[in-house]
Amino acid sequence: MSLNRHQIRESAFKIIFAKSANPDADLSELQDQVLEEFHETEAPDQFLKDLVMGVSLNLEAINETISGELKKGWTVKRLESPDRVILQMGTYEIKYTETPDKVAINEALELAKKYTDEDARKFINGVLSNIAK
């Protein structure tokens, strides 16, 4: 059984989150661990690989884009880890993929519903909406 796009995004979130907590971790091992949670035995979907690698390879530019939307004195590193990863993924999809902006923002908000609180969801929505303009 292959994962749907939302499950793939959630898997990517978990992989990127784990990698941000442990920069020395092996991406392939993280990917295997996350996919085991879904009892997924098939090879990872290309979309998952593209999302994880796209965020990783463009992280500096993504963080600069996010920083431009933060209040003066705030940095991306100051954000809570789940919020930061969701913003990084949403920004990547808005800026670097063909995903419609509304879909990228909605998917980010779905992740935020599960992994953050109401204030963080509003914050993520505002930042990504500004980035999409």
Curated annotation (Swiss-Prot):
Pfam families hit by this protein: NusB
Superkingdom of the organism of origin: Bacteria
GO molecular-function terms, A-Z: RNA binding
UniProt-listed GO biological process terms: DNA-templated transcription termination; transcription antitermination
Record Gene3D superfamilies: NusB-like
SUPFAM superfamilies: NusB-like
Keywords: RNA-binding, Transcription, Transcription antitermination, Transcription regulation
Cellular component GO terms, alphabetical: cytosol
Purpose of the protein: Involved in transcription antitermination. Required for transcription of ribosomal RNA (rRNA) genes. Binds specifically to the boxA antiterminator sequence of the ribosomal RNA (rrn) operons.
HAMAP family to which the protein is assigned, alphabetical: NusB
Family stated for the protein in its record: Belongs to the NusB family.
The protein's name: Transcription antitermination protein NusB
Species name: Pediococcus pentosaceus (strain ATCC 25745 / CCUG 21536 / LMG 10740 / 183-1w)
Gene (UniProt): nusB
